[in-house]
Amino acid sequence: MSYKKDIQLEAAEKIAIDFLAKTKDLYKKYLLAGSVRRREPIVHDIDLAVVPKGENFAAWEEKATKRVNGIGGRVASFGETITSFRYRGVQVNLFLCLNEDAWGVTQMWATGPKGHTIGMTIKARERGLIINSRGLWTREEPPKLIRTKTEKDVGRILGWKYKPPEARGKRGKA
């Protein structure tokens, strides 16, 4: 179930900062992503790219649920790569990076927008690679993860000029 609603960018930033202040110890790394990072004036939800702390994902999931419940939020859904919470009336999506060598892809995937993500997928296919929310992969068997520490790494590997988040999805702006 989606809890998306329209809110002003400034209000979304305040909610995101508050959420992060109360949950940041759950992550090794985190980045405010999505439409907030792209500086969209109207935001429908809050997206965060995160590397969960700890080796045991099930234990992390339990700890995250308790924390969010404890700060007045609630779990909307847990998935393999995206977890959603409802917090202060807004949907907060965590894009989970379960391998730090895929951090660059997770940042790009979480920041979007959808057209940018589709473009990455096309570029990867043209280069004989696979890209998804888990990382950038070779097509050999078994597939090998290609290390992407930054979004610029992803662009370099795909032969795609890096666009800052606020320019993504906007024609004629670079």
Task: Give the ranges of each region predicted by the language model.
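Acidic, metal-coordinating catalytic segment for phosphate/diphosphate chemistry
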Residues: 3-11, 56-174
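Charged, flexible boundary elements
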Residues: 7-21
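Active-site nucleotide-donor binding segment shared across nucleotidyl transfer reactions
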Residues: 17-46, 50-57
